[in-house]
Amino acid sequence: MHKIIRVLALVYASSVSDTAMVQAADHQTKPTIVLVHGAFAESSSWNDVIAQLNRHGYRTIAAANPLRSVAGDAAAVSSVIRSLQGPVVLVGHSYGGPVITEAAHGKSNVKALVYVAGFAPDTGESSLSLSGQFPGSTLSDALLPLARPDGGKELYIQQEKFHEQFAADVPAARANLMAATQRPVTEAALAEPSNAASWKTIPSYAIYGSADRNIPPAVMKFMADRAHAVKTIVIDGASHALMVSHPGEVAALIEEAAKAP
C-alpha cells in the first residue's frame, strides 16, 4: 500500500512539474502587453482588461504615464520596453496613443500597436490638432484648468461632468471613483507635436466607441484608415472609457494583435 502511495505521489509530482514547465514555456513565448493610460485616467483603468489577459497567460504591465509631455512620457515608457525581453505589444488609450507611437520608435521588439480610443498622430501632429479636424468633441467645456508655477496649465475634467463626458456607459458609482482619482495632463502635452509615426512601420489595431465625447469618432476612423489598421472595431454606444465599459472586447483585440505572425 505504501509503495502504491509513493508511486502515485511521484506520478502526481511529475504531472505538476510538467504542467508548470508547459505554462512557463507558454508564458515566455507570448508577448508582454504594456498598457499606457491617457489623460484624466490612471493605471487601474486597465484592471478588467488585465484580468482577462492574465487569465489567458499574458504578462501585463500597466505603465504609469506621467502626462507631462509627449517626449518625456514616451521616454518613461521606452525605459519599460528596454527592460523587457522578447516581443512587446503596446496599448495606448487616448493621449496614451501619441506616447506609445513615439515610444515604439526604433524598438525592434515592439510587434504591434493597439489604439484604444487613442490618438495615432503623424509626425508634427498633436492630440489637439487631430481632435479639431472633425467636429464632435465636447471636452473643452468640461475641463477644469489649474495654473502651474511655470505659467502653463494643468487640466482636469470637472468631477460633476466626468460621468457624462468621459464614461457615460460606466455605472455612476464607478465613474465617480474614476473622477476622483483622475490624473491631470498638462495643456502643453496635448499641444505637443509628435516626433515619430511608428504606425507606418509597425502593425496597428484600433478600437473605439461611437459615442465618444472626448475624441470625435470621425477622427479615430480617419487615423485608423490612414494607418491601414489591421483591424478596426467600433463599439456602438461606447464612451471614451471603453477599456472600463467593454474590457472583453478590448482584451480580445489585444490578444489578436499578440497572436498575429
Task: Describe the role of every protein-language-model region.
Residues 206-208:
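Short beta-strand/loop motif that positions the catalytic acidic residue
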Residues 210-238:
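Conserved loop-alpha-helix segment in the C-terminal half of the alpha/beta-hydrolase fold
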Residues 91-92, 96, 100:
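Gly/Ala-rich beta-loop-alpha elbow adjacent to hydrolase catalytic centers
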Residues 177-198:
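Active-site nucleophile elbow and catalytic-triad environment of alpha/beta-hydrolase enzymes
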Residues 109-110, 114-150, 155, 159, ...:
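Flexible "cap/lid" loop of the alpha/beta hydrolase fold
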Residues 238-247:
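Catalytic histidine-centered segment of alpha/beta-hydrolase-like enzymes
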Residues 31, 199-204, 227-230:
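Short, proline-enriched alpha-helix->beta-strand connector loops that line the catalytic pocket
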Residues 29-70, 88, 106:
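Conserved HGGG/HGGXW glycine-rich cap/lid loop of the alpha/beta-hydrolase fold
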